[in-house]
Amino acid sequence: MTTLAWFAGRSMVLDLAALTSAFTVGYLLKSTSTPTSTPTSTDKAGTPPGSTIHHYGYPQGSVTKPNNSKTEKENGSPKDSKGNVPDCPYKYLVGLYGHHHFAGFVEALQPTLKDEDPEKYTLVLDIMDAVHLCLILVDDICDDSPKRKNQTTAHLLFGSCETANRAYLVLTKVINRAMRTRPVLGAELVRALELILEGQDLSLVWRRDGLAAFDAEEGGDKVSVYKKMAQLKTGTLFVLLGRLLNDGGAQLDDVLLRLGWYSQLQNDCKNIYSGEYANNKGAIAEDLRNGEMSFPVVVALGDQTTSSQIRKAFGSHSDGDIFDALDALQSSCIKNKCSQALQEAGRGLENLLAIWGRREHMDSLGS
């Protein structure tokens, strides 16, 4: 599918209330990690009326906001200039990733922008920080992730409600700022958010309704179906950067879409094959445990020697079945296919990948 086909027919301006609603529905229906909710009806495969759905997300029990106690400081959480943990989930995450996380890309793609148009340079980087980090804030809530970059996740420090609301607030402010000062960039931002949330919503539906929903998807082989979702959810983030730099121009769409696909593949593989990544996230095979589709899972579903283990794990979510599925994912056949796909996806992107980093070692893939 071409990039132009993806974006065809997308409105340049989306009502802000609709955007906020989409953001909320796409993420926060995952309301608890322990209780279940019962739908009244459904037209989705694999979720018959009256059945219960296990929702991953908000942790049970009390959470405390960060303080300046000795215990908090010993945890190594990001501090401000006075040695205090930031009293804001977004600033806390900025402390983990660094301010203007995409600056290296901007300097490589438009090296003169900072001097020629410093206002645009700052706005572009602020937009990219807001989209990237706010999506991470809410994604960690959905996955009930205990760690991010080997630090306690924001929602476990500040609470899920405050963390999610702060993400909406930061995004709303940057949308209004862009629409007011650079309307073309504002329109690109809104369009990108719609596409990203469309991809994330599809991923969450698959997680909610299980493999029956994924199997029911049309559009060719299952790798292609998964890739389409990943290009919406992750590829659009990188495409947005090119659109912002080129005032809506599509000159960089193809290469940045490829970079986004590589990033998704790399993240999926690290989730299964990197002990370092598991330590930084505080969980092994988090995607598999959450019943979430990933590239290794899709590959294993298409292999007769591993399909049954994956399907059993997605059906039961039991620890024993999950460990059996993890063994299947780490078999040489599946590892080799994932390694080959990762190498092919990265061809010609070496310079951009060097800027992106993400160098956690993957023992099982020999990288």
Swiss-Prot record:
<dbReference type="GO" id="GO:0008299">
    <property type="term" value="P:isoprenoid biosynthetic process"/>
</dbReference>
<keyword id="KW-0325">Glycoprotein</keyword>
<feature type="binding site">
    <location>
        <position position="139"/>
    </location>
    <ligand>
        <name>Mg(2+) 2</name>
    </ligand>
</feature>
<feature type="binding site">
    <location>
        <position position="132"/>
    </location>
    <ligand>
        <name>substrate</name>
    </ligand>
</feature>
<feature type="binding site">
    <location>
        <position position="271"/>
    </location>
    <ligand>
        <name>substrate</name>
    </ligand>
</feature>
<feature type="binding site">
    <location>
        <position position="148"/>
    </location>
    <ligand>
        <name>substrate</name>
    </ligand>
</feature>
<dbReference type="InterPro" id="IPR000092">
    <property type="entry name" value="Polyprenyl_synt"/>
</dbReference>
<dbReference type="GO" id="GO:0004659">
    <property type="term" value="F:prenyltransferase activity"/>
</dbReference>
<feature type="signal peptide">
    <location>
        <begin position="1"/>
        <end position="22"/>
    </location>
</feature>
<feature type="binding site">
    <location>
        <position position="234"/>
    </location>
    <ligand>
        <name>substrate</name>
    </ligand>
</feature>
<feature type="binding site">
    <location>
        <position position="143"/>
    </location>
    <ligand>
        <name>Mg(2+) 2</name>
    </ligand>
</feature>
<comment type="function">
    <text>Prenyltransferase; part of the gene cluster that mediates the biosynthesis of paspalitrems, indole-diterpene (IDT) mycotoxins that are potent tremorgens in mammals. The geranylgeranyl diphosphate (GGPP) synthase idtG is proposed to catalyze the first step in IDT biosynthesis via catalysis of a series of iterative condensations of isopentenyl diphosphate (IPP) with dimethylallyl diphosphate (DMAPP), geranyl diphosphate (GPP), and farnesyl diphosphate (FPP), to form GGPP.</text>
</comment>
<feature type="binding site">
    <location>
        <position position="264"/>
    </location>
    <ligand>
        <name>substrate</name>
    </ligand>
</feature>
<comment type="pathway">
    <text>Secondary metabolite biosynthesis.</text>
</comment>
<protein>
    <recommendedName>
        <fullName>Prenyltransferase idtC</fullName>
        <ecNumber>2.5.1.-</ecNumber>
    </recommendedName>
</protein>
<dbReference type="Pfam" id="PF00348">
    <property type="entry name" value="polyprenyl_synt"/>
</dbReference>
<keyword id="KW-0479">Metal-binding</keyword>
<feature type="binding site">
    <location>
        <position position="143"/>
    </location>
    <ligand>
        <name>Mg(2+) 1</name>
    </ligand>
</feature>
<keyword id="KW-0732">Signal</keyword>
<feature type="compositionally biased region" description="Low complexity">
    <location>
        <begin position="32"/>
        <end position="42"/>
    </location>
</feature>
<feature type="compositionally biased region" description="Basic and acidic residues">
    <location>
        <begin position="70"/>
        <end position="82"/>
    </location>
</feature>
<feature type="binding site">
    <location>
        <position position="281"/>
    </location>
    <ligand>
        <name>substrate</name>
    </ligand>
</feature>
<feature type="glycosylation site" description="N-linked (GlcNAc...) asparagine">
    <location>
        <position position="150"/>
    </location>
</feature>
<feature type="binding site">
    <location>
        <position position="233"/>
    </location>
    <ligand>
        <name>substrate</name>
    </ligand>
</feature>
<feature type="binding site">
    <location>
        <position position="139"/>
    </location>
    <ligand>
        <name>Mg(2+) 1</name>
    </ligand>
</feature>
<keyword id="KW-0460">Magnesium</keyword>
<dbReference type="GO" id="GO:0046165">
    <property type="term" value="P:alcohol biosynthetic process"/>
</dbReference>
<dbReference type="GO" id="GO:0043386">
    <property type="term" value="P:mycotoxin biosynthetic process"/>
</dbReference>
<feature type="region of interest" description="Disordered">
    <location>
        <begin position="32"/>
        <end position="84"/>
    </location>
</feature>
<dbReference type="InterPro" id="IPR008949">
    <property type="entry name" value="Isoprenoid_synthase_dom_sf"/>
</dbReference>
<comment type="similarity">
    <text>Belongs to the FPP/GGPP synthase family.</text>
</comment>
<keyword id="KW-0808">Transferase</keyword>
<dbReference type="GO" id="GO:0046872">
    <property type="term" value="F:metal ion binding"/>
</dbReference>
<feature type="glycosylation site" description="N-linked (GlcNAc...) asparagine">
    <location>
        <position position="67"/>
    </location>
</feature>
